[in-house]
Curated annotation (Swiss-Prot):
It holds the Pfam family UPF0270. Gene3D superfamilies: YehU-like. InterPro entries: UPF0270, YehU-like_sf. The lineage of its organism: Bacteria, Pseudomonadati, Pseudomonadota, Gammaproteobacteria, Pseudomonadales. It comes from the Bacteria. Belongs to the UPF0270 family. This is UPF0270 protein PFLU_4323.
Length: 75
């Protein structure tokens, strides 16, 4: 299920993005400040380049690049 980023409260969206950008394996040795990484993800969401995907079975959200989202979720 796709969740519109603007359906989330600002603080909730920020926490979701921060969780995503601070996960192991997401920095790839990049020393970019947290605020910059959060801003980049927020911009990707507003441009439609990234989407929030909710899995009802696991009850978890994840951020994905649009081209990585399973096609059936767009139906």
């Amino acid at each position: 299920m796709l969740i519109p980023y603007d359906a989330l409260e600002v603080d909730t969206l920020t926490r979701l993005i921060e969780d995503f950008v601070t996960r192991d394996g997401t920095d790839n040795g990049d020393d970019t400040p947290l605020e910059t990484r959060v801003l980049r993800v927020r911009q990707a969401l507003t441009k439609g380049q990234a989407l929030i995907v909710f899995d009802p079975d696991s009850e978890q959200c994840q951020l994905m690049l649009k081209h990585d989202v399973p096609k059936h979720l767009f139906d």
